[in-house]
Amino acid sequence: MCLLYTHFYHLILNTRRVDSSFFVFSFHLYFLNDNKGMSPLCLSLVGSGLHLSVMHLLFHVFLFLFDSFLRP
């Protein structure tokens, strides 16, 4: 469900027309809580002059690093 929501959210962001000079890119990180449910941690990045695809790439790099090194 978490992955489905994340990909749906990316689909919405990729189909929206975003001004490249200023945008607010919000994404959700999900962490397992004690009862094995998913609790969202919402982060927002405000960029100036950055393209959305660069932020999307950085998001996937962060997820790779999180899965490889930070997850217990």
From Swiss-Prot:
The keyword Plastid applies. It comes from the Eukaryota. One of its GO terms (cellular component) is chloroplast. Its main location: plastid. Keywords: Chloroplast, Plastid. It is found in: Plastid, Chloroplast. This is Uncharacterized 8.5 kDa protein.
